[in-house]
């Protein structure tokens, strides 16, 4: 998938979340420059692989076969004792996941 397509899908999903009054954490909107300015205070976000996952499952056609998800919390047995995760998954009408 091209980065521009991924960025468009993320924008679409942010709009969907806002319309549903499902509020993502502030770091969901950080730019690459914002991330570069952050230090170890954001290690948990990186260590636990939080954030956006956009996939077409290798199909090359996200519109037909794909899934978007945002991970807000994720357990990491190597670093902490959280035994759970919290994710929101988004699919389009007719999309196969």
Feature-to-residue mapping (PLM):
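A short, N-terminal "cap"/entry segment at the start of jelly-roll beta-barrel domains
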Residues: 1-84
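Short, conserved beta-strand element in jelly-roll/cupin
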Residues: 83-84, 88-95
